[in-house]
Amino acid sequence: MRIAIAGCGQLARMLALAGWEMGHHFSFIADPGEGTDCVDGLGPVVARDRYPEPAALFEALGRPDVVTVEKEHVSIALLQGLAEHSLVAPSPEAIRICQHRGREKTALQNLGISTAPFQLVEDGPSLITAVKALGYPAFAKSCEQGYDGQNQWLLRDPESLEALAAQMDSLPPLIVEGAVHFDRELSMIAARSVSGETALYPLAENRHREGILLTSEVPAANISEETQAQANHIARTLLEQWSYVGVLSIELFDEGGKLRVNELAPRVHNSGHWSQDAGVTSQFSN
């Protein structure tokens, strides 16, 4: 099978190395200015800006059977164009939802999946109104592009709120989330095939430092049958309702056994790296 990956980072490398063992061949789509050291030598690297037309890009990539992603921040128009020539998995629509925290949380709530309370804001007055409704502490995050603690603000008191409100004219739209008093952070790696077969990996307990994942303990300790059933239901609901194809990473808050979804990633995830050595099948092989 010929597989094209949008992105040239470490996750693309791990995907390609896993796929090589299965006889697959890879090519990579590089954004302008994107480094390619991680994937050099693993297959053709095609600069996206050299092929603005999807048909030409498809040919330059070697006419792949499947196009996938190693990151969610990919041009949706590009993926939609490639979808006219190849299977794009996950779907452009699933990736579009996961690119924007507001769309993501709205989609989750529409499926009856619990999240932190939230409001979307675009200016200083709407930010102040949102925090008054949600209470302190609150967390403001960019709707797009924020990850690993970047473009995020902890609002503890009126002073920190006023300071951020004064900056809103120079900031993109934000999502403001009310505090969730969780006991721990969990995550699950889930996968679904084109034929609808699903696989769920064990829950991991994750510890972060300054917003960056430090350790994952797998399987997470002291998971009750009820908690596991909740996690399985969340994962299966998303996979089935979205007709999802590929790997979906689900970050969760555990509040005394009640689970809320924090964020989704429509791709392989660093909390699933353990599966390379400790899993019968790694996340990258799916």
Task: Explain the meaning of each model-derived region.
Residues 1-99, 103, 110, 125:
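ATP-binding N-terminal substructure of ATP-dependent carboxylate-amine bond-forming enzymes
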Residues 32, 72, 143, 179, ...:
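Anionic group-transfer/hydrolysis microenvironments
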Residues 97-187, 191-241:
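Active-site nucleotide/adenylate-binding loops and adjacent lid/helix of ATP-dependent enzymes
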Residues 211-213, 271-277:
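A short, polar/charged loop-to-alpha-helix boundary motif
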Residues 223, 275-280:
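Short alpha-helix boundary/capping segments
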Residues 243-273:
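Conserved metal-phosphate-binding beta-hairpin within the catalytic cores
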